[in-house]
Amino acid sequence: MAPLPLDDANMPLFTVGQVSEMLEVQQAFLRRLDEFRVVRPSRSAGGQRRYTRNEIVAVRYVVELMDDGLTLAAIRRVLELETKVRQLEAERDALRAELARLAAGA
């Protein structure tokens, strides 16, 4: 049986209104996050923003950072750096695995 779209955390299912209600934020705030390239939801065929569960988690994180006093520009940079760290950690892990494989074969 194929998984339901609700099982996919990356499936864009939720509208701006739904996310606004879930997180108790203004719809204008969500649009601003998109405009500032902080959280960029995909668009429906009709051009409406659609949020994934992962993007909703990201919006919640952004709200926490704003509550701590960060600006949207600073938050965007934090998110970029966190993404870069995850990429570098994955690369490091792949290199460690390759070294272990080479050492085992030596």
Predicted regions located by residue number:
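Arg/Lys-rich, alpha-helical DNA-contact motif
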Residues: A2-P12, E21, E35, R40-P41, ...
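Short, Lys/Arg-rich nucleic-acid/phosphate-binding segment
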Residues: R43-R49
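DNA-binding alpha-helical recognition surfaces that contact promoter or target DNA
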Residues: R32
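Short coil turns linking two alpha-helices in DNA-binding domains
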Residues: Q26-F29
